[in-house]
């Protein structure tokens, strides 16, 4: 019931000006950040999350909404609730390290919210980097973790470089294939700067993230060529083809436009996130929609993530590095633009 009520509003929420607006049959309504935060927090506590975990999870979701990334914000909340309803999300997980060295670790998320597990694991990577220069953490037995950028940006608070990867539900066909064998498998790299804002690169390894297709499906929109293919393997602009057996395409769209490079990037994310940790990989990654049956075979545990933190002082003087990053960003931002 909670999921059903919230889905209608959350699936259409977006950021406008200083508040959030959602559309309904009676027109537009604006609610504040705090109102939305309190509502989402109450829903997560209702399913059994502690106040601390609920607040963290909502903070991760709203960090997407305030950046205009509607596909990864509170629109996802109903999906998490439905996964809890079918016992695929543990609201009170016992997150723990199952293997570690001074610079590496494997974390078991105990089927908890990825929104909670990911920051926990990233903090482990940061602590290791603080001790020995770099920290690398692979995670098993987790779930969808929201935007990768939130977790990687935690490193900025320590003047470190942050990295976050995750595998995802198999919706992507490798180059030349008609089978959905990989997820959108995003990569995020965050680099601190000096005077200016940091470098934050957060992207799917597909031409478009699944959330973008979901938005087009709700609006009956048209997808650009190179985003998806139908179940016969032909390029399509109909976003509903994805639900009819089609697939998302690797970054590049097709071989002629470099999709093999996107295929490689997505594969690397899958290997680092899952095979390195003992999570499920490839076509065996658990689907995000609760109504989609779980794969019959489960070679690993849950969804996998991978996090990294690098202490700049382990490579060179931090102030000199930041000065160079500022110069680099200035150079790129002041390039001559196309006419």
Question: Where are each of the predicted segments found?
Answer:
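Active-site cofactor/substrate anionic-group-binding motifs, chiefly glycine-
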Residues: 73-126
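Secondary-shell segments that build the walls of catalytic and ion/ligand-binding clefts
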Residues: 221-284, 288
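Phosphate/diphosphate-binding glycine-rich loops and adjacent basic-rich segments that engage nucleotide
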Residues: 172-242
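Catalytic-core signal marking the mid-to-C-terminal active-site face
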Residues: 27-31, 36, 271, 280-339
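N-terminal glycine-rich anion-binding loops that anchor highly charged ligand groups
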Residues: 29-32, 49-75, 89-100, 297-302
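A generic, well-ordered mixed alpha/beta core segment in the N-terminal half of proteins
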Residues: 105-194
